[in-house]
Swiss-Prot record:
PROSITE patterns, alphabetized: ABC_TRANSPORTER_1, ABC_TRANSPORTER_2, POTA
Catalytic activity: ATP + H2O + polyamine-[polyamine-binding protein]Side 1 = ADP + phosphate + polyamineSide 2 + [polyamine-binding protein]Side 1
Subunit structure: The complex is composed of two ATP-binding proteins (PotA), two transmembrane proteins (PotB and PotC) and a solute-binding protein (PotD).
InterPro entries linked to this entry: AAA+_ATPase (IPR003593), ABC_SmlMolc_Importer (IPR050093), ABC_transporter-like_ATP-bd (IPR003439), ABC_transporter-like_CS (IPR017871), Mo/tungstate-bd_C_term_dom (IPR008995), P-loop_NTPase (IPR027417), PotA_ATP-bd (IPR017879), Transp-assoc_OB_typ2 (IPR013611)
GO MF annotations, alphabetized: ABC-type putrescine transporter activity; ATP binding; ATP hydrolysis activity
Organism: Ligilactobacillus salivarius (strain UCC118) (Lactobacillus salivarius)
SUPFAM superfamilies per UniProt: MOP-like (SSF50331), P-loop containing nucleoside triphosphate hydrolases (SSF52540)
Organism placement in taxonomy: Bacteria, Bacillati, Bacillota, Bacilli, Lactobacillales
Domain ABC transporter: 6-237
Chief location category: membrane
Class of the enzyme per the UniProt entry, highest EC level: translocase
Name of this chain's protein: Spermidine/putrescine import ATP-binding protein PotA
Length: 362
């Protein structure tokens, strides 16, 4: 098995008031992938980034880079660079000198600096902007300058601390494509932190979902979206319908007063569970044809779909994304298939969750 590029082994970070920001965190980062640390403010994602960068020390535990323990290695000796949320550009320097700054500090020859800065500008599509003042650049252009300044030093890892948060929605979407494309061109490891689940789903090879100093679940965007480990992940990653249920037996679950075939298994008979169905997986139909009968409460037009909120006979609330319209107050049916149902156990560890999925997916 290939050695991880970065490893955290039982890392804890505490402050003087004994508040634990990271609680026994362990994970591996492989070379050449795009990773996202995803979670709300205060979950510990920025602390992980700072420990990797050498800007903060772990209270206990070990951090490895290329198989070597780096807890005591200073920040300037680590093969990582950081793009900060505010970009941290020098306003008194033009674009060229901002990008060249780190190379000059390292006393790289002038001709080599010019070659590397020119290549970095080409990579971020800012050819010809060498003499432009930072104050004359748009938000998206400033971000590209910050990225060029980071990649010009040939890091093995690029750390990105919520760099899209200050941009408007359209520009954020454009920069998601650009960052993903740039990572593939460079072939280096990107570690991106955000609280925006859409950014994480769009760009990542792997996502680490954090909450309260713990990594709750890790996996590909598809795995985490389709098979969240618990209520927190299901609710945080996209919109979800989450209702209480009973796992009758393998591939049969009860919720909303009825039993439905599903694709989940490996649980105890009649075990209390939570059931997730994504809004886009619910299909509007007539009450007679629907597996669930519901009453429409409200409807909003969102451009690409209608957002329809409904209530079933037991009081469960359902959110539906549909291209079909519904009328508030009318009774309708909701249709879905076994593969649209995801069943979650209470208090299941990620290790047990992965083992259970493997047991019935093989």
């Amino acid at each position: 098995m290939k050695q991880p590029l970065i490893s955290f082994k039982h890392v804890v970070k505490s402050y003087d008031d004994d508040v634990q920001v990271l609680k026994d965190v362990s994970f591996d980062i492989e070379e050449g992938k795009f990773y996202t640390l995803l979670g709300p403010s205060g979950c510990g994602k920025t602390t992980i980034l700072n420990i990797i960068a050498g800007l903060s020390d772990a209270t206990s535990g070990d951090v490895y880079f290329d198989g070597k323990r780096i807890n005591d290695v200073p920040a300037n000796k680590r093969q990582v660079n950081t793009v900060f949320q505010d970009y941290a550009l020098f306003q008194h320097l033009n674009v060229y000198d901002n990008i060249a700054f780190g190379l000059k500090i390292k006393k790289v020859p002038a001709d080599k600096i010019k070659e590397k800065v020119t290549e970095a500008l080409r990579m971020v599509r800012l050819d010809g902007y060498e003499d432009r003042a930072i104050s004359e650049m748009s938000g998206g252009q400033r971000q590209r300058v910050a990225i060029a300044r980071a990649i010009v030093l040939d890091p093995k890892v690029l750390l990105l601390d919520e760099p899209l948060s200050a941009l408007d929605q359209k520009l954020r979407a454009e920069m998601q494509y650009e960052l993903r494309s740039l990572q593939k061109k460079l072939g280096i490891t990107f570690i991106f932190i955000t609280h925006d689940q859409e950014e994480a789903l769009a760009m990542s090879d792997e996502i680490f979902v954090l909450n309260n100093g713990n990594i709750v679940q890790s996996g590909t965007p598809v795995d985490i979206y389709d098979e969240p480990i618990n209520h927190y992940v299901a609710d945080f990653i996209g919109e979800s319908n989450i209702v209480n249920g009973i796992m009758i037996k393998d591939e049969l679950v009860e919720f909303a007063g009825q039993q439905f075939p599903c694709v989940d298994g490996g649980m105890k008979p009649n075990e209390p569970v939570e059931v997730v169905i994504r809004p886009e997986d619910l299909v509007l139909t007539s009450p007679e044809k629907g597996q669930l009968k519901v009453k429409v409460d409200t409807q909003l037009f969102r451009g690409v779909h209608y957002e329809i909120r409904c209530t079933d006979a037991l009081g469960n609330k359902w959110l539906v994304h549909s291209t079909k319209r519904a009328v508030p107050g009318e009774n309708i049916g909701l249709s879905f298939g076994p593969e649209d149902i995801h069943v979650m156990r209470f208090n299941e560890s990620e290790e047990d969750f992965d083992a259970r999925l493997d047991s019935y997916n093989d």
